[in-house]
Amino acid sequence: MRKAGLWGLLCVFFVSEVKAAIVLEEERYDLVEGQTLTVKCPFNIMKYANSQKAWQRLPDGKEPLTLVVTQRPFTRPSEVHMGKFTLKHDPSEAMLQVQMTDLQVTDSGLYRCVIYHPPNDPVVLFHPVRLVVTKGSSDVFTPVIIPITRLTERPILITTKYSPSDTTTTRSLPKPTAVVSSPGLGVTIINGTDADSVSTSSVTISVICGLLSKSLVFIILFIVTKRTFG
């Protein structure tokens, strides 16, 4: 009896040590806020085809929190939605797919797929999932726009009021006109708008006529003086 009792204790101790030694390696997912987590958890179709599955969160130092579970019948493909969580159960493919949408920083933590049959302990189907959610980059490139102002020439306008009708007339400022007069030569040169109408030939003829008239006067005076003193 004592030997049987000792062997039983040794077996229990050995099994507990083996269970403690089997620690599933975590699978890490690094995502940004607003993205979607997708995890595929395979299971043994011979053992768990007709079993209820669940997606759980493992808070530090607390009991596992069951977020969403599959619904009957378990032998047919089904899809369950619970808030941001979705379970897609496909027994023919021996696959449980989990989706978490619109991730936030507060969703960071440890999760797992399990065979859910309370009050018995859940059976872990896949590696625990370590989810790390970070905020996205808020840096947005804003182009700098520098306005360029070009100076344009505009005509000068003069506004004149005429009474009594108080009508307003707008006209362009005329170009300045300069008048150069030569009394001796009898030539008048107009510079400005009127000067454009005077041709070069008319000016030349006027100058020649003036020189001839002066020459004739000089000759007449010379003849008169000679006769007087002759």
Curated annotation (Swiss-Prot):
Residues 1-20 form the signal peptide. GO terms for cellular component: plasma membrane. The keyword Magnesium does not apply. Disruption phenotype: Deletion mutants do not show any influence of the antiviral T-cell response. However, TREM1 deficiency impairs secretion of CCL2 and TNF-alpha by neutrophils in response to viruses. TREM-1/3-deficient animals have decreased neutrophils in the airway and these neutrophils have a defect in transepithelial migration. The keyword Signal applies. Glycans are attached at residue 191. Residues 21-124 form the Ig-like V-type domain. Disulfide bonds join 41-113. Its main location: membrane. It is a single-pass type I membrane protein. One of its GO terms (biological process) is innate immune response. The chain crosses the membrane at residues 203-223. It is found in: Cell membrane. Residues 21-202 are extracellular. Keywords: Adaptive immunity, Cell membrane, Disulfide bond, Glycoprotein, Immunity, Immunoglobulin domain, Innate immunity, Membrane, Receptor, Signal, Transmembrane, Transmembrane helix. Residues 224-230 are cytoplasmic. Cell surface receptor that plays important roles in innate and adaptive immunity by amplifying inflammatory responses. Upon activation by various ligands such as PGLYRP1, HMGB1 or HSP70, multimerizes and forms a complex with transmembrane adapter TYROBP/DAP12. In turn, initiates a SYK-mediated cascade of tyrosine phosphorylation, activating multiple downstream mediators such as BTK, MAPK1, MAPK3 or phospholipase C-gamma. Monomer. Homomultimer; when activated. Interacts with TYROBP/DAP12. Interacts with TLR4. This is Triggering receptor expressed on myeloid cells 1. The gene is Trem1.
